Structures are given as structure tokens and as C-alpha cells.
Amino acid sequence: RLYAINPENGFFGVAPGTNAKSNYNALASTMKNTIFTNVALNNADNTVWWEGLDKNPPEDATEWKGAKVNGKEYTSVIGADGKPQKLAHPNSRFTAPAVNCPCVSPEFNNPNGVPVSAIIFGGRRASTTPLVYQSFDWTHGTYIGSAVSSETTAAAVGAVGVLRHDPMAMKPFIGYNVGDYWAHWLEMGEKLGDKAPKIFNVNWFKQDEEGHFMWPGFGDNMRVLDWIIKRCEGTIDAEETAIGYLPKKGDINLEGIEDEVTPEILDKLLYVDKDLWKKEIAEMRRYYKEDISDKGGHIPAALIAQLDKLEERLNK
């Protein structure tokens, strides 16, 4: 069986948007022994501030570039991009020791590690990819990991909104030939056999026609993780689709957010648009060839076979 340890001693996160409602435990973790970068400073009491923390920017503020400003006046000015000026950089960060977190697991520092039941990939996609789906098996899950891609955000250098491939959501950390990396995943699946973790893909960032996020995210992501846990426990069934297993109606707990995530919105979040997925197939073939093979990499045959099978299922 696969076991895991966390080699990190703490957490880091993007500050803007983090508040007591969106991520209570993350905010609680920053109350002591925390490093902040590129946030705003409230000069009156020497505390930090960022957009989304609350609706009261400090009047006596130092914005992230170091200028002393009246925060309320500063954030009311529309910048060159047509949006209000920001006191904190959009990608400003905090990093805090794990022991600060109120809900840190007692197993966090277990030297024996903890058993892994699920591996969850995730990209940032405005369309195409549903809220959550499960692979058919380990090899299919490895293909899903190889196909992870995201529209760029403020966290990446370059234009925002451009699709970038991010295999396993680990591109900056894959330190050797990516084909060998994928082959290692496939080999691990053979070793683990029926004890291999189930593999899932999530997308918290699907948007509606007006460009608004349809899923509330943050703490409500636990609702999707709850479905994943139940799938691992074998207590619920799932709907088989061309791309993998999707939740059945009623299996994601929406209690308390029914007004925000209506049945119609959930249908959109879980919709598999075959036309968009066929475009995804073409892009994956281009990516495998131009970005990997043509640059000296190699693609395991099992992944090409998975791509072919996906195309066949979409064409049925």
C-alpha cells in the first residue's frame, strides 16, 4: 500500500480573498509566527491587510510597494486596468507553521506516514473540466494527471488567462524527463495493484456565461472531498461517462448552499461537453508531440493508448 508523509513544516497561501468565512483555519494559522509578503500594512496598529480580508481598508496604510496612502481613498481609485487599485499584490502570500492550524491532524508528524486512499489532481479551467470526476483505473488516472492544465493567474509570470499545461499540477517540481516521470507513475501502479489509491480530478474554477465562478470554493470544497471519501469507502455509486466517473444527482451534499448552487448550476458544473473535450484531445496530441516528443522527451505507450480510448468513448 502507498503511504505518505508531509515533508513541509507549514502552510503557505495566497492572501487576497482569505478571511474568516472563506478559510477560517488558514486565517487562524496566521495569528503568530507568520511571514507575509507583498501585503498592505495598517500603520495604526502594525497589522496586515489585503483585499478580501474585510471591507475596511486601513486609512493609514502602507501599500505593497511601500508607499504610505489613505487606504480607503487609494482603493477607490480606478487603475489603468479598469479595476480599483490594490493595497496588496494579487499574489501576496502568507506562510505559517503547521502547528498554528487549529485543525492540524495528530498524524501530521507521524514518522510512519499515513495510508493514501485518494490522489487528487486539479487545474484551473473556466470550462471543459467538470467540478470533480474519478478515473476508471490507475493508468487512466496517470493519463488524467499528464493532461492537467490551467489558465494562468497572477501566480504565473506572463499573460493571465493563457492555457498552460501543468502535468500532475507539478510542472515546476518535475526534475527529470517527464516521460520517465510518467513511466514511474505507471510502474508504481503495477506494484500497488488493487491497493493503488483511487485517482480524482477537481476543478473549483468553472465559470458561467458571464465569467462568474459557479462553485463557492474555499471551505465548501469539503463537500467534494466528502464525495471522494465516500467513493473510496465504496458507499456510493457513480455515473460512468466518457471521461470517467461523475457524481450522481444528490450525492454531493449541498445543504446550506442550495441558493448558491442550484440544481441547474450543479448540472453545469458536472456537464461533460463532448465538443470541448474533442478539442482537448487535439490539444493533448499537440502537447505530447510539440512540447514533449519534439523536445527530446518521450511519451509512454500506455498514455497514448489512454488518449486513443478517450477519443473513442467521446465519439460513441
Task: Please report, for each region that a protein language model flagged, where it lies by residue.
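Catalytic or ion-translocation cores adjacent to nucleophile or general acid/base/metal-coordination motifs
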Residues: 1-46
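Flexible, glycine-rich loop/tail regions that form catalytic "lids" or insertion modules at the edges
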Residues: 48-316
